[in-house]
């Protein structure tokens, strides 16, 4: 594909139109996946090596921690703040921007997707795809086996329960669950007293 054709696809992608993959993007993806492979094989105690790889892989990466393995598409479209924790098997398909703000927690097997394909099979057969960015606001907790789809924003401090498929925005300070994911309640005073079922916070203080 020529430089002009590649630029045309970049323009279509930026405008939210259907686009197709390009050789240049494929090469960038292969380089990113090679770096991620090195990260996934690194020793947990070799923190300096991991810090170097994180800077090479991601667009920006704060003081956060990833439990390998992790998988990405591009890497440079991902922005991660401070105080975040990612449990095992995180998947970040970042053909568009993924923004993860400070103090976000991921359980195991969380998938964030920015790319989709047409439902109509003849269009899909051409390799056409579309993108929409995903934002996860500060303090959110994404529990295990959650899938977040293109164009979604998760609000500050919200909790998305295990096994949910998030197809639309979730507001701040709520608990949401289900397939498709829906808000079930707000985070409230009860949550200040009980941290799990009948277990009171005063029994679980860390000091």
Per-region residue spans from a language model:
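Beta-rich strand-turn-strand
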Residues: 143-169
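A contiguous, mid-protein "functional segment" used to position or interact
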Residues: 165, 171-187
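A glycine-rich, hydrophobic loop/mini-helix early in the fold
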Residues: 57-59, 64-77
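Terminal amphipathic alpha-helical/low-complexity segments used for targeting or macromolecular assembly
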Residues: 1-63, 181-185, 189-207
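Short secondary-structure boundary/capping segments
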Residues: 10, 56, 126, 133, ...
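Structural detector of well-ordered beta-strand residues that form the stable sheet scaffold
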Residues: 65, 113, 175-177
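Short-chain dehydrogenase/reductase
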Residues: 141, 159, 175-177
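Flexible, glycine/small-residue-enriched loop-and-beta-strand segment within the central core
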Residues: 70-80, 85-153, 179-180, 186-196
């Amino acid at each position: 594909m020529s430089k002009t054709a590649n630029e045309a696809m970049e323009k279509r992608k930026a405008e939210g139109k259907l686009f197709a993959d390009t050789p240049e993007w494929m090469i960038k993806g292969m380089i990113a996946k090679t770096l991620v492979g090195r990260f996934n094989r690194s020793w947990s105690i070799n923190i300096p090596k991991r810090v170097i790889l994180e800077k090479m892989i991601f667009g920006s990466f704060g003081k956060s921690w990833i439990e390998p393995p992790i998988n990405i598409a591009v890497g440079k479209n991902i922005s991660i703040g401070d105080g975040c924790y990612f449990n095992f098997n995180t998947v970040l398909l970042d053909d568009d921007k993924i923004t993860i703000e400070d103090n976000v927690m991921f359980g195991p097997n969380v998938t964030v997707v920015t790319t989709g394909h047409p439902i109509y099979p003849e269009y899909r057969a051409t390799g056409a795809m579309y993108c929409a960015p995903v934002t996860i606001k500060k303090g959110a907790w994404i529990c295990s086996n959650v899938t977040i789809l293109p164009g979604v924003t998760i609000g500050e401090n919200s909790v998305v329960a295990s096994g949910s498929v998030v197809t639309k925005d979730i507001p701040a300070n709520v608990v949401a669950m289900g397939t498709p994911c829906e808000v079930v309640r707000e985070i409230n005073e009860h949550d200040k007293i009980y941290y799990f079922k009948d277990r009171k916070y005063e029994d679980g203080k860390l000091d």
